[in-house]
Amino acid sequence: MKKGILIALCSLAVLFVACKKPVEPTSDPVDYTPTYVGNYLGQFDFNITSVNNQAQTLAFTIDNIGMDIAKGTAFNAITATVTVDNETRQTSGTATAEKADFESVNLIIDKPDQNYYFELNLKMEGTKAENDTTLNIVGTFSGSGNATILTPQGVFEQPFDEVSGTLSGNLVKQ
C-alpha cells in the first residue's frame, strides 16, 4: 500500500509540474516620471475649513508658487522643490499614469504685505491637464499661524493655533 501511495504522489507531482506554465508579463513597466518632470509656476488657493477646532470659511491665494519636479532614483520616483517667495522645501513622491502623489512638505507662508503668516504641512497630488503644460494640484493642509483681520469693530490679530483646509492650484510649465 505504501508503494501505491508513493506512485500516486509521484504521478501527481509530475502532472503538476507539466501543467504549470510560467507567468508572462503583460507588458514592460512604464516610467511615468517624464510626464511630470519640469519647472512649474502658478498659484495655490487655500480654503481654510477649521480654525482652532471650530468650523470656519476663510480663503487666501498665494501667487508665484514654484515647483521644480525631477526624476527620482527609484522607478517612477519624483522629487519636487517647492518655492514660495524665498522659502524653499523639498519633497518626494511617485508618478503613475493618473497622478503624481507627493509626500507631505512643511512650508512657511509669510506675507506681511497681506497681513498673515502660516506654518503649514501640505499633502498634495498633481494631475496633468489635457494641454500637457499645466499641472493641476489638489490637497490638504494643516498647521498654525496668525492673520490681521479687519472687522466692523476694528482691526485685530487672530492667532490660529490649529488651522486646516484644502488647497488647489494650477501650475504652468515654464
Outline where the language-model segments fall:
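Bacterial Sec-dependent N-terminal signal peptides
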Residues: 4-8, 12-43, 168-174
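Edge beta-strand at a domain terminus
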Residues: 138-174
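Generic short beta-strand segments
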Residues: 41-49, 103-110, 138-150
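Surface-exposed ligand/attachment interfaces on beta-rich extracellular proteins
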Residues: 53
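Predominantly extracellular/secreted and cell-surface proteins with exposed
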Residues: 50, 58-133
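A short hydrophobic beta-strand element
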Residues: 40, 76-78, 131-143
